[in-house]
Amino acid sequence: MDSLSVIIVGLLVMFWAGVIQGLTGFGFALVSVPIMTIFLSPKKTIPIVLLHAILIVIVILYEARKWVDLKRIWPLMIAGIVGMPFGTYLLIFLKASTLKVLIGSVIVLFTLALLKGFKRKIKSEKLAFAPVGFISGLLAGSTMMGGPPVILFFTNQGLNKNVFRANLVCYFATLSLATIPAYIAGGLITKEVIKYAVLLLPAMICGGITGIKLAHIVQEQLFKKIVLIILIVAGLMSIASGFGLW
């Protein structure tokens, strides 16, 4: 596909991904990575998504800051940062098709757990945050999809919509900023990546603003359904792409 076609598709994808991120507090990478890797390699797509994700989560974090509970989630953020460099190593050395299947499989597995109503109240959150954060960081570094483990954990703990969204974007902002040095060191932030990131930026901004506005009017039950639908569709698309079916 030529550059112009990639940009046109990218504008549509980034707008929709921005809407989802603004609405739910997550989903930017879950929506954009599976589709964009059909047209660009993961080694180009994932750094582009990272640069956009940093901007949008910071904006959402400012809007949702009053619901953030740093005392609760700081162990999660530290564990995520520790896992992230290992994920970056996987991104550099794994084949594109392998990464796509890995991305999709992780998403689908976690979504099925949510659909099955998997729930087990965990009293010692700080201890549980260590493995959850590390796995999330590993996935974030390799696929920019570190959300599913944390989303499942927060859902399991019964957080309401506003707290769920605020703590999630706070975690993502921290992890995304920590990922930048590893990507630079790995040679993943190239001139081509920056070019695409700049060209697609307006669509992401418009989508993010739209999503933030929708977040104030969408009811809790509809919010949860949207989350599950996004997860399952994105996961299946990524697997299909990895096997050459998409």
Regions found by a protein language model. Give the residues of each.
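Hydrophobic alpha-helical transmembrane segments in multi-pass integral membrane proteins
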Residues: 91, 96, 100, 140-145, ...
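Membrane helix-loop-helix hairpins that form the core translocation module of multi-pass transporters
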Residues: 43-116
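Transmembrane helix exit motif
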Residues: 57-65, 100-127, 212-213, 233-246
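Small-residue-enriched transmembrane helix starts and helix-helix packing motifs
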Residues: 1-20, 124-138
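Small-residue-mediated transmembrane helix hinge/kink sites in multi-pass secondary transporters
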Residues: 34, 88-92, 152, 212
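Interfacial loop-to-transmembrane junctions
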Residues: 209-232
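Small-residue-rich hydrophobic segments that form or flank transmembrane alpha-helices
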Residues: 7-74, 147-205
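Residues within membrane-spanning alpha-helices of integral membrane proteins
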Residues: 11, 50, 103-107, 111, ...
